[in-house]
């Protein structure tokens, strides 16, 4: 205390204004203690609100969200989950402002485990729904179906998540490989880019029905398609007509789809009878 007062008097005699002297003394009384270091950042004499700004910036650069396990779209190879890292800013700020002099404080993160982990994928082996339709039409139509099935293949839908066909498949354009093929427009059949992918959405719809998952959005064609009974179809058109379903089960499901011989097949894998072990 005497040293601080003496320092204040010395600064005054050197012509330093009283407001600056007061601020200097106030920081030494109420700021972080001398010699306190957070990682490699000197923190001495900072006020708590200043410490918080520094800690938040450090935490922001080091924080990483957890990443669920997933599947490689083409091969189905497992992509392992990644743990995240979270920082309790309030706790770190408290550690800094209450630290004794000459303390070295480490920015300790808290590991965050994702909800859906690598080991869970091994349990999603039950066949919940399986449906196929006959493959018909021109090479362009077949290619459009192949591309759309490749887009939805190996998609994991978490509990409570909504699967959107349009969102997963994306816009059907020439640049993305889609070709001109017949599409149903009103009461007419006309050429259009991406013609045929409604067979993919229809086959998916029926697999979802068999899996007893909740249908969120579906429309049927105005003209019955040749590959399925009218009323069991699900038309899609970018971006306004979509097919959506929700995974209202307790565990994730995997959507799989591919052309097998002269059949378009979509099947749903999951876990029957409850939560993960």
Question: What name fits each language-model region?
Answer:
Residues 1-277:
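Surface-exposed, secretory/extracytoplasmic low-complexity segments enriched in Ser/Thr/Asn/Gly/Pro
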